[in-house]
Amino acid sequence: THEPGAAATLRFAGLPTHDKRVELWLPHNEATLLVALRSDAALEPVGDDGRRVWLHHGSSISQGSNAASPSTIWPALAAARAGVSLLNLGFGGSALFDPFVARAIRDTRADLISLKLGINLVNADLMRQRAFAPAVHGFLDTIRDGHPDTPLLVVSPIHCEIHERTPGPGAFDLEALASGKVLFRATGEPGERAAGKLTLEFIREA
């Protein structure tokens, strides 16, 4: 459910008087509306600071669903360590080869592109084995239209025990919820692989 919070004011006092770059990391698991930005000195948008741009697209694992803060999501940590500017297109439950996402990546400046795909296709039970490879190639072809020479890394899904050999959809484990734990279970059956349902093992081997 959506529960709007009260308006709040954040104040940053005691900053040095010289020109400085200020980055505000907004919550990664909430929608934030900026009502006003006030300052006692001139504000200017940051231009090109010379850093390379890393564009990453993935699932909630990339969005940081379980991270403690937006700057401690794994892509943010990796970008900080590499000294690059991160554009994180991690969409919880929605890394699904949507054409508009491919077009957005195609039309966005990037020096490196990485795609971490697979888990949402299985836990959403979105498509069958026959559609998987063409969907991947269509997604990549669209991106390549705008980035013919940009390094592009496709990362297979990390281990997820419930979906390694068992198709989705995934669902909450109600017994675990009753005990205060958030766990998931696969509602598909291993035998459904023969009917074309996806598993993580199939995606890695395709």
Residue locations for each model-derived region?
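Generic structural hydrophobic/aromatic packing signal, biased to beta-strands
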Residues: 1, 12, 22-24, 78, ...
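Short amphipathic alpha-helical surface micro-motifs
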Residues: 5-7, 36-39, 96, 135-136, ...
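Short linear motifs at secondary-structure transitions and domain/linker junctions
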Residues: 2, 28-33, 88-91, 128-132, ...
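Positions that flank functional sites
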Residues: 93-94, 120
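Serine-esterase "nucleophile elbow" of acetyl-processing enzymes
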Residues: 15, 22-92, 99-109
